[in-house]
Design a protein with these regions (language model features):
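Short, small-residue-biased leader/transition segments that mark boundaries at the very start
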Residues: 1-5
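Glycine-rich phosphate/pyrophosphate-binding loop and the adjoining helix
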Residues: 98, 103-148
Length: 148
């Protein structure tokens, strides 16, 4: 399945770089981007981003976004979280990253797993001003007569 998703993602991209290509255009702050979303974000990747250990193009691109004050959204995939994971998330947030764990939300009336995934991705895309078609943002709760 991994190769299928990789090919689908590559088909959507203008340019694809191998992870070892630290000389790629996106490894420089002079190459403008709005930022980046790392989804899913392993704890190894989150740790490297949080601690500035730029040993691959992915981490270097995140490092560049952070130093250039561009948006970096991390969607960590681990569960349960250890103290080390939480410390690294805190370090990343202190560096300016936005942490959006792909958690289940129960307030948006999801009907399927796809709805839940799309909601988490919608939250990440909204960080860049992109509102996906059909995305339902919270519009406030309505109390029933029993709740009043």
């Amino acid at each position: 399945l991994g190769d299928v998703y990789k090919r689908q993602a590559e088909a959507l991209a203008d340019v694809c770089y191998p992870p070892e290509d630290l000389a790629a255009a996106i490894s420089s702050g002079s190459f403008y981007t709005d930022g980046m979303i790392v989804a899913p974000c392993s704890m190894k990747t989150l740790s490297a981003i949080a601690n500035g250990y730029s040993d691959s193009l992915l981490i270097r691109a995140a490092d560049v976004c952070i130093k250039e004050c561009r948006k970096v959204v991390l969607m960590p995939r681990e569960m349960p979280l250890s103290r080390i994971h939480l410390r690294n998330m805190s370090l990343a947030a202190e560096a300016g990253c936005v942490i959006i764990p792909p958690m289940l939300t129960f307030y948006n009336d999801s009907k399927s797993v796809d709805d839940m995934i799309n909601h988490a991705l919608g939250k990440a895309l909204m960080q860049f001003g992109i509102v996906p078609p059909g995305f339902q943002s919270w519009r406030g709760g309505r109390l029933s007569k029993e709740d009043k």
